[in-house]
Structure formats: structure tokens, C-alpha cells
Curated annotation (Swiss-Prot):
Similarity comment: family membership: Belongs to the glucosamine/galactosamine-6-phosphate isomerase family. NagB subfamily.
Function: Catalyzes the reversible isomerization-deamination of glucosamine 6-phosphate (GlcN6P) to form fructose 6-phosphate (Fru6P) and ammonium ion.
Record protein name field: Glucosamine-6-phosphate deaminase
GO biological process: carbohydrate metabolic process; glucosamine catabolic process; N-acetylglucosamine catabolic process; N-acetylneuraminate catabolic process
InterPro entries for this protein: Glc/Gal-6P_isomerase, Glucosamine6P_isomerase, NagB/RpiA_transferase-like
GO molecular function: glucosamine-6-phosphate deaminase activity; identical protein binding
GO CC list: cytoplasm
EC number: 3.5.99.6
Keywords of the record: Carbohydrate metabolism, Hydrolase
Listed PANTHER family: GLUCOSAMINE-6-PHOSPHATE ISOMERASE
Length: 249
């Protein structure tokens, strides 16, 4: 595990984007695992800037997103399809046929989950998976008490997660109650994982993830066992960590 602490959110976003750029420079047909939520938005902006400055080429890249709400049309501005278009895909040269996001509108949702894992496998596996982390240390929509071996599956969202996401909707009632998410088992198969966190409200989750007992009660704690994990934090998210355990960048 490698832990980097940045001065602020902008520096964190820049560092994360540089790591993605390095991955694509080394392997032009990289398979990227992407996340939604507020944390990676700055990274996506930096990647768009890099593309506009001809520093990065996405034409051979494939992307797989972590999750999508169930029964929320992709045209809805709160769907993760919409989010990814609005924050990244509409502004870079990634091919539409190389973008994969779970289909939350699928008639056979269980089959959609199996199909999604198979698509990742057929692509050769994810080279680098971007993750955010919830206040309760969830990753993707893998909530506390999750089975660590689970592949992509349908999850009932915890009330705390719905409340956290309600800020993106007009009301709590509009937040979908279910989502398709890559399971911990699917995420863990990624060759490299990059976990991003900002703000004091994430400090406890980060502390438990790095120092705590590995337990389904803290879903992100399983990342302690991953062979190639990089954690990028701002000062606030790192506030509970021992300074000897991280590098300031």
C-alpha cells in the first residue's frame, strides 16, 4: 500500500489524473475502472485538460464503471451514464463502443450482472480501478456487512447512502433504493486500485480502512490485502493517520 497526501483537492485531482495518464502512456489500450460521486470530478476535469492539450489519447481505452442505479433511465441527469458523459466522455476521444456501464434498466437484472463480469474478463481485466469511499467505508455500493467474495450484483442501498446521495436529487424519495454494483470480488481482481478521499468527514473511514481490522463491517478494509493499492488523500482526509505512514506530494 502506498499513501500520498496532497495539499488540497486540486492537487489530489492532478495527481490522480497523472497516474491515469501514465497508465495510458504505458499501455494505450488500458482498461480503466471508473467511479462516480463528487470526489473524482476534479480528476476527470484534469484528464479533459490533458486530452485538450494532446497529452493523452483515449482512442484505444476501454472503461468500466463501478455501478449504476436500478430503474433510473440513462437520460435522467442523476444516472451514472449521464454523469460520466457530463464529466468526461463527452469531452474526450473514447469510443462509445468501448464504454461500459451497468444497465440498470435491464429486464433480466441478474443476467446483466453476470454479463458485466464476463465483459470485464473478456477485455482482459481492469488495469487500474478508481474508487471513492463513503463515510461508512463503502466502495462502489458495497455497504457494511457485504460478502467480500461477491461479484457484480444488485444491492439494496443503505439509508445512510441514500441520504448522502439525496443532495443530487430533489428529495430523498427520488433516490433509487437499488443499484447494480461491482462486488468486492470484482473490484479486488483489478491489477491496480487507486482510492481517492477528501475532507474531514472521510478521515475515520480512511483510518479504519488502513489501520482497522479487515471486516465486512468496513468494506474498504479488504483493500489492505490488495497487491497494488495507492491511496490519495487531502490533508483533512489524512488527519487521523500517522505521518510516518504517508508521503506528502
Amino acid at each position: 500500500m502506498k499513501i500520498l497526501v496532497c495539499e488540497n483537492y486540486d492537487k489530489l485531482s492532478e495527481k490522480a489524473a497523472q497516474i491515469i495518464m501514465s497508465q495510458i502512456t504505458l499501455k494505450s489500450n488500458s482498461i480503466l475502472g471508473l467511479a462516480t460521486g463528487s470526489t473524482p470530478i476534479g480528476m476527470y476535469k484534469k484528464l479533459v485538460e490533458m486530452y485538450e492539450n494532446k497529452m493523452i489519447d483515449f482512442s484505444d481505452v476501454k472503461t468500466f464503471n463501478l455501478d449504476e442505479y436500478q430503474n433510473l433511465p440513462i437520460s435522467n441527469d442523476q444516472s451514472y451514464h449521464y454523469f460520466m458523459d457530463d464529466n468526461l466522455f463527452n469531452y474526450i476521444n473514447v469510443k462509445r463502443e468501448n464504454i461500459y456501464i451497468p444497465n440498470g434498466m435491464a429486464n433480466d437484472i441478474e443476467n446483466e450482472c453476470i454479463k458485466y463480469d464476463n465483459l470485464i474478463k473478456e477485455a482482459g481485466g481492469i488495469d487500474i480501478q478508481v474508487l471513492g469511499i463513503g463515510n461508512n467505508a463503502h466502495i462502489g455500493f458495497n455497504e457494511p456487512t457485504v460478502n467480500f467474495e461477491k461479484k457484480t450484483y444488485v444491492v439494496e442501498l443503505e439509508e445512510s447512502t441514500k441520504i448522502a446521495n439525496a443532495r443530487f436529487f430533489n428529495s430523498l424519495d427520488e433516490v433509487p433504493s437499488k443499484a447494480i454494483t461491482m462486488g468486492i470480488g470484482s473490484i479486488f481482481e483489478s491489477k491496480k486500485i487507486m482510492l481517492l478521499a477528501t475532507g474531514e468527514n472521510k478521515a475515520k473511514a480512511i483510518y479504519d480502512t488502513i489501520y482497522g481490522k479487515v471486516t465486512p463491517e468496513v468494506p474498504a478494509s479488504i483493500l489492505q490485502f490488495h497487491d497494488d493499492l495507492i491511496v490519495i488523500l487531502d490533508k483533512e482526509a489524512a488527519s487521523l493517520l500517522n505521518p510516518k505512514d504517508y508521503k506528502v506530494v
